C-alpha cells in the first residue's frame, strides 16, 4: 500500500476544496453574513495550509495499483465531506456534526436529501456552498484533480474508473488528463447555458446560480422552503429539460462537438433513457388526472418535471407525489433505481446496466431453447466483453446486498417499511426525497445518528459505485506489500 501517494493526492483535494470555499466566503461577505463568512474562511485557510504542507514534496515512489486507486477515491470523498461539513458546524447553523456531514455528503454525492426543515435560515453564503457542492461532485472531484495533477503511467485511468459512474469508462481522447479536461469543458459550458436560460426565464440571479449548480450536478437541494413551487411553469419546464440533458452520457456531447452526428444520435442508452422518460411521463399524467385536478396540461407538466427529476436522480419537486396514485409511486420507485445514463452526472443503477441485464436474460432464455447457439450481447453496436457483463452482474449482487443490509439497519428506528425502503432508495441511488415520512415536503431529521451514518455511507457508496467504499472494510486492503 503506497500510503505516501494516497496522502499526497488527498492533500491536493484539500487544496482544491480550500480554494472552492472562497466562493461561498465572498457570497457571505456580499450578503453581510459575518459569522458564516468567518466560519467558511477559517475552514478554507485550514484546508489550504494543510494541503500546501502535505503537497510540498512529491513522493519518491508514485507507483500504485488498483486497490490504492479505490482507497484514494473513497478517501478523497471522505476527507472532502468531513472538511466540507465544518462551515455548517462551526457557524452553528447545523449544531450537530453528524447532521452537517449528512448535509454536505448529500451535496457532494448530488443526492439532495436534507435534515433541514428551514433551509433559508442557513443564509446565502452557506446555501451557496451547499448548492456548489452539487456542482463539484457532479462530474467528480478527482476528475478535476486529474486536470491539474496528471499522474501518468496509467494511474489516471485507474482513479477515473474508480470514480466515474457506469459499467465502463472510455477515454474520449488518448490521454486521460485530456479526457478529464474535455469532460469539464463540456460540463462548464452546459452549466453556463443552463444558468443563462434560468435568468432569461425570470429567476433572480442568486436562485439561477444555485439552481443551476443543482441541475448540472443532478443534485436537488432547494434554496427556498417552498422548493420549486415558487418558480414559474416556464422556469420549471427549463429545469426539466436541463435535468434530462445532464442525465445523458457526456460522450454523446463530445461526439456532437466533434460533429459525429450519426454516432451521437444512435446511442442506444440515450434512446432507451428518453423512451423511459416519455412512457413514464404519459403513464403518471393519465394515472393522476383526478389527483392533480387541473386538467391534462397541468398533469403532463408536473409528471414531466417529476419523471425528469427522479430518473436523473436530481430530486427537485413541484408537487408532493406522496398523494399520487399507488401505480405512479411504483413507477417513481423504478425510476429511482434505474437512474440516468452512465457517464452522466446522474445516479442510480444506470440505464446501460439495465440494458445489459435484460439482454443477458434474453441470451440465457435463447440458450435454453437453442443450447448450441452462439449469441453475443451487443451495446452501442459493439459486442461486449464477458468481463463487462460479469461486472454488471457482480455490481447488481453488491447493490442488492448493501440495499438489504441498509434497510435492516435503519429499521431499528421504528418507522414503517415504505419510509425506510424509500429512504434507502433515495440515499443509495442519490435521489433526494423518498416517500411517506421522507417525502418531498419532509426531511431526514427524523432518523437517529446511527441511521444517518448508514445513509451517509449509502450516499457515498451510491455515488462511487459501491466497491471503493466496500474495499475500505477489507483487512487485505491495508496490508503492506513489498
Label every model-predicted segment.
Residues 1-482:
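Membrane-proximal intracellular helices of multi-pass ion channels
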